[in-house]
């Protein structure tokens, strides 16, 4: 038996698939691909699958992964990739299968790219509203937690935010805490921009990578 890490992208309309539905989709694809999987024991056996870090609904992912256990060690990573790629939709392309080098529990940071297109007005006007938000002494936001709603200041987490302006859009790149210890969604920033500055825009959001506490790329 061996564990392999399947790397895939979650693009286009797939960003609106919940994590539960993604799990079911992946399980069906694995079954169709006839990969010799290891199943859990008990009354309801299931294929062993461990996703690195679920994506929020509405967000795309450039470098997502799921760990699976394979019964036959003779099957190669390349063969797993080819079989699974044939069984998944075009919006969930598999681009690599590797041996896991880092446990998902080590994930501590994530990088994101947001593209904001104003519904009305110009990108320059939207940039002015973003700058006004960032100039506030605090950016108060509310976040759902296991114990209820938490109220906190988002501004200390935006120190690595970079903004580039195009003719018709803004592109935001940012690093935020992610993982089991602390998870700050980039949607908190866009929600604050809309609520506190009255900005109206379309947002395309992509999680580009995951990292450990030392900022080493999750592999």
Walk through the language-model features, giving the residues of each.
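Short glycine-/aliphatic-rich beta-strand segments at the starts of folded cytosolic domains
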Residues: 4-9, 33, 66-68, 108-116
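N-terminal ordered "arm"
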Residues: 13-39
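Short, charge-patterned binding micro-sites
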Residues: 38-68, 101-104
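Helix N-cap motif at beta-to-alpha junctions
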Residues: 71-76, 119-121, 179
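Short amphipathic alpha-helices in soluble, non-transmembrane regions
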Residues: 78-88, 125-134, 188-190
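Extended, positively charged loop/linker patches that create polyanion-binding surfaces
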Residues: 101, 107-150
């Amino acid at each position: 038996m061996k564990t392999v890490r399947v790397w895939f992208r979650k693009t286009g309309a797939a960003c609106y698939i919940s994590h539960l539905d993604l799990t079911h989709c992946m399980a069906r694809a694995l079954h169709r691909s006839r990969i010799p999987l290891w199943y859990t024991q008990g009354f309801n056996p299931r294929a062993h699958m461990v996703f690195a870090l679920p994506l929020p609904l509405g967000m795309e992912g450039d470098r997502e992964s799921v760990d699976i256990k394979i019964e036959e060690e003779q099957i190669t990573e390349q063969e797993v990739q080819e079989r699974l790629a044939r069984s998944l939709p075009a919006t969930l392309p598999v681009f690599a299968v590797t041996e896991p080098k880092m446990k998902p529990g080590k994930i501590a940071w994530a990088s994101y790219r947001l593209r904001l297109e104003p519904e009305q007005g110009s990108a320059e006007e939207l940039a002015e509203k973003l700058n006004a938000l960032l100039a506030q002494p605090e950016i108060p936001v509310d976040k759902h937690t296991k114990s209820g709603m938490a109220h906190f200041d988002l501004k200390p987490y935006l120190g690595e935010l970079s903004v580039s302006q195009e003719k018709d859009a803004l592109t935001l790149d940012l690093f935020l805490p992610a993982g089991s210890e602390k998870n700050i969604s980039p949607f908190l920033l866009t929600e604050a921009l809309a609520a506190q500055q009255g900005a109206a825009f379309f947002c395309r959001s992509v999680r580009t990578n995951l990292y450990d506490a030392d900022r080493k790329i999750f592999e």
